[in-house]
Amino acid sequence: MEEQNQTPTPNTQAAEDAARTPEAGADEVGRLTQQVAELEAKAKEHYDMFLRATAEGENIRRRSQDEVAKAHKFAIESFADNLVPVMDSLQAALADGTGDLGKLREGVELTARQLAAAFERGRIVEVNPVGEKFDPHRHQAISMVPSEQEPNTVVNVLQRGYMIADRVLRPALVTVSAPR
């Protein structure tokens, strides 16, 4: 058998030295035992820190989900609060049995103003595009009619559209001028 050429390393050298003298061996075992205990304590401390960080991350994630769920659930609350007076006015009009058309018209006008104010507070914008160029993203053409206006110009609005910010809630139903 060939004998391998081994260079003594500090660990193997220390082990060889410890094996030569019993007191030195006992000291080395004691030192290594203490070092193992210190490293185990440090590992336990790091594991505890890891568990705490993981738990904190999970708590943050759960709280964020709860906040998003609440925001979705109550996002319309402000707008709904603005619509309650409109409903009150409509119920009062229905409860009025006098049959006075002037009074009824006045009540409907008041209700329309209340609804317009609620829309304004909710940032809902009315789309009434008479005279504007037809935009398929904001308008829905119902028909084309001969007209003196430029082709593809909105001639008549059959039903107004509504937008919130830059998003179309409902496109305006329009009649568009036909090409000449």
UniProtKB/Swiss-Prot annotation:
Keyword Cytoplasm in record: yes
Biased amino acid composition, Polar residues: 1-14
GO function terms (MF aspect): adenyl-nucleotide exchange factor activity; protein homodimerization activity; protein-folding chaperone binding; unfolded protein binding
Subcellular location: Cytoplasm
GO cellular component, one term: cytosol
Family: Belongs to the GrpE family.
Database matches in SUPFAM superfamilies: Coiled-coil domain of nucleotide exchange factor GrpE, Head domain of nucleotide exchange factor GrpE
PROSITE patterns from the UniProt entry: GRPE
Keywords, ordered alphabetically: Chaperone, Cytoplasm, Stress response
Pfam families linked: GrpE
Protein name, UniProt field: Protein GrpE
NCBIfam families referenced in this protein's UniProt entry, alphabetically: PRK14139.1 (NF010737), PRK14140.1 (NF010738), PRK14150.1 (NF010748)
Region of interest (Disordered), residue spans: 1-30
Keyword Cytoplasm: yes
Gene Ontology terms describing biological process: protein folding
Domain of life of the native organism: Bacteria
Gene3D superfamilies to which the protein is assigned, alphabetical: 3.90.20.20, Head domain of nucleotide exchange factor GrpE
Summary of subunit composition and partner proteins: Homodimer.
Stretches assigned to coiled coil: none
Major subcellular site: cytoplasm
Summary of the function given for this chain in its UniProt record: Participates actively in the response to hyperosmotic and heat shock by preventing the aggregation of stress-denatured proteins, in association with DnaK and GrpE. It is the nucleotide exchange factor for DnaK and may function as a thermosensor. Unfolded proteins bind initially to DnaJ; upon interaction with the DnaJ-bound protein, DnaK hydrolyzes its bound ATP, resulting in the formation of a stable complex. GrpE releases ADP from DnaK; ATP binding to DnaK triggers the release of the substrate protein, thus completing the reaction cycle.
